[in-house]
């Protein structure tokens, strides 16, 4: 108003923003001039500061919607599914005389596997540079018989990389817990502490970002492709999943007498029923060219949706 420069950014400017959404699938329900999309701060996931050579950047977890409310991102469906989960889980708990006062949500522990390859070797392979996986090459001398890597000592160069990654993730608020060798040669794993599903997904994205950036600084390339090499194990993203809250605990916990724990059996049967009725949707949610190449070959999970309850519950 007085011709001066704006030198501040208020909180209201961060809570909601407007971005172009014309290139995102909005269901064809907009007029040609309605190209806008909206971002909104997801306050359930903490903001963080990401350091880069250009300076410090404030990163705010957000949802991205079309002007009609259609989700244009992958965070909104998670938040909406948690809402639906809370409503239905609370409804079932009331049948057992439990009135939950705290929201019930999904919880997850995402274990991230990856390959570390020296950058000099990767630079000599255009397929690794472009596709992130080997398109040709000789078979390894062993397949599933490899055990010297998994039960061996972590190489000092890799251990230095892991320690660097862990320090950076702690600064970003990611509670990483374990780091170890994996089965295939040059394959490793990092896993965070179990946490709420929405936060676990955000932290997994941060873990993958930090792994790639840090590997370059250590003269290595981090391959996150699910199946970068044939005839040896690929890299999975094992998800330890449950539902519950601090108030009601883990609703998948069987207790001392699972056969007599009616509440546990009801929630267990709901998962079995959901898998039976919606196997196609669940399979599609993890379907991609890279993951479909991994499933069913030198791996534990098959290419179909399956469920194993263990001998005790099956009997």
Regions found by a protein language model. Give the residues of each.
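Glycine-rich, acidic/polar active-site loops that bind/position phosphate-bearing ligands
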Residues: 1-225, 229-315
């Amino acid at each position: 108003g007085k011709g001066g420069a704006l030198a501040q950014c208020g909180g209201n400017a961060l809570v909601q923003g407007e971005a172009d959404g014309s290139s995102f699938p909005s269901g064809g329900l907009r007029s040609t001039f309605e190209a806008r999309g909206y971002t909104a701060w997801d306050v359930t996931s903490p903001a963080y500061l990401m350091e880069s050579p250009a300076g410090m950047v404030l990163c705010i977890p957000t949802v991205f919607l079309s002007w009609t409310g259609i989700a244009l991102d992958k965070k909104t469906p998670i938040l909406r599914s948690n809402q639906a989960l809370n409503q239905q889980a609370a409804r079932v708990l009331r049948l057992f005389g439990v009135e939950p006062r705290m929201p019930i949500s999904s919880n997850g522990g995402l274990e991230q596997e990856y390959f570390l390859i020296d950058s000099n070797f990767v630079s000599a392979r255009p397929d690794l540079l472009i596709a992130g996986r080997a398109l040709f090459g000789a078979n390894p001398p062993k397949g599933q018989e490899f055990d010297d890597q998994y039960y061996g000592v972590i190489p000092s160069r890799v251990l230095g990389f892991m320690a660097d990654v862990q320090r950076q993730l702690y600064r970003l608020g990611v509670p990483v817990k374990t780091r170890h060798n994996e089965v295939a040669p040059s394959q490793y794993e990092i896993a965070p502490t179990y946490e709420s599903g929405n936060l676990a997904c955000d932290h997994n994205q941060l873990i993958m970002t930090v792994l790639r950036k840090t590997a370059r600084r250590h003269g290595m390339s981090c391959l996150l492709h699910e199946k970068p090499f044939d005839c040896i194990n690929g890299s999975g993203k094992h998800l330890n999943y449950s539902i519950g809250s601090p108030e009601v605990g883990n609703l998948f916990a069987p207790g001392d007498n699972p056969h007599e724990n009616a509440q546990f059996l009801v929630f267990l049967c709901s998962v079995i029923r959901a898998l039976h009725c919606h196997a196609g949707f669940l399979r599609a949610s993890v379907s991609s060219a890279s993951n479909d190449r991994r499933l069913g070959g030198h791996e534990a999970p098959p290419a179909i949706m399956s469920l194993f309850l263990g001998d005790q519950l099956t009997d």
